[in-house]
Amino acid sequence: MGERVVPIVPDEARTFGMEGMFKQIGIYSSEGQLYEPEDADQVMWYKESETGVMLEEGITEAGSFAAWTALATSYSNHDLTMIPFYVFYSMFGFQRIHDLAWAAGDAQAKGFLIGATSGRTTLNGEGLQHQDGHSHILSATIPNCRSYDPAFGYELAVIIEHGLKEMYENKKNNFYYLTVTNERYIQPPKPKSKSIDKNIIRGMHRVIEVKEPKIRLLGSGAILNECFKASEILNDYGIDNEVWSVTSFNMLRKDGMETENENIKNPLSKDKKSFVAKSFSENDIPTVASTDYMRAYSEQIRPYMSSPYYTLGTDGFGRSDSREKLREFFEIDANNIVMTSAYALFKEGTLDKKEMQKIYKKCDLKRNKNSPWNE
């Protein structure tokens, strides 16, 4: 299968840590290397050759995506199945080439789009031009695009393996959009649950489980770590909680729509439950979701929630600052998750006024701060 895989980048290969491919597989050039590269004295020098595999297209997202589309439709146009991986700054994906992506979907393209350095607060220090907080919302407009925002390496591996099987073995006419980040954090081993792979693909799985939780936290991508921090703070206040890793709010929405549509068409049959409803049926408790994307991303599952549901997101323009400061500014960090949880429990009557105020004071709520989307 390896000879069919084609990595594609515009001009950010070193940013993505892909320079090791220069020497290992080479950069394709129809005329070979016609110059001595500036980094010729380095180990990972810029090596072009007629037998190169990697496509390094320069600063042209449209050209790079055109190459991806040619490879992604090669199975049909040339009876030669190829497996393209186009890796790019996630902000410069659908934001710039959405019409081409729509056309690729219409042409039944098959392959992987990797939105690297994703997340409005995770790619810190590069300002509003680079900080993506809405690519998953844009990807949701393309019917056969399957998009995921995994937090851990094992989730990414499961999704790619599933995608390969779906597209090339089961002949499904889909393509996949996956967001990954440049933030370093601990990668846990894959849980041993029999349903783990299936749940990752369906859109979410539980990563912290307790016997009688009072609040449920949902997180995706790098922001799942903020949920872990919030979980520990809540534990300090005696508030038991469970945490879920949401790999795709888009897929959860598709499942919810499909379930609802089937119920409407079969009014005399017992209504089926969406994956969200079934997963949360054990505990009818408030839920707080926090992501590195606009609130509209996590809002997609609200129709399928039976208990109070609160969403935190990165509505507004990006900023240049540290991740910690950006997450505080956009109100998606651990403290804001904890405060929202305290509010939900107070409104429900589970948390008394004194304890709620104590938590708010500890989390240093800035009452006079403008909402980030109004800044």
Task: Describe the role of every protein-language-model region.
Residues 1-188, 195-196, 250, 256-266, ...:
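Thiamine diphosphate
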